Amino acid sequence: MRRPFHTPPPVYDPARGLLHSDHFQIGYVTNDLDRAVDIFRTQFRIEKFRANDAEMPGGTKISTRTVWIGSTMYEIACGSGPGMEAFSKYAPPDGEFVLKLHHFGYLVPDEEAWQAMEREVARGGWQMYMSNDTPGYVKACFVEVPEIGHLVEFILPREMLIERFNATPVA
């Protein structure tokens, strides 16, 4: 179906404001990944997900399930252990079942735009979480934005993450 209205092209200018980047992802957080995936399968008829699971030293774990629905990537994330507070703060591993909106994901096209985003975060007085820069994979961070009630994630994808995104199933 073609949209019956004009959709502007993505904006890539975080220097204009924190949300002036290409919004491509909706992220959910959970403390029970199997149960959350089952909800997406039974309630929303999403059959296939790309699974990514990582365990690190010290008991840190992160698991995600991703799928493209139209031009939006949906992500369900479950993180626990040291360094995963950006997830466990919103879905405590030992708490009651949680599945809720966690973040909007924004693509950052290049290092210049990344630096503009960092300046905007500093200007706004927001807190940055889990900032990482993995050569060949991704430069990413979460920013806590209490004014809108959820985190925003900024992603500057590199070759390996681009391959992973391209291999993500389409619902």
Q: Which stretches of residues belong to each language-model region?
A:
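A cross-kingdom feature marking solvent-exposed beta-strand/loop segments within repeated
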Residues: P10-D13, I46-I62, G83-H102, G124-Y129, ...
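N-terminal strand-loop-strand beta-hairpin
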Residues: R3-H6, Y12, D22-G27, Q43-I69, ...
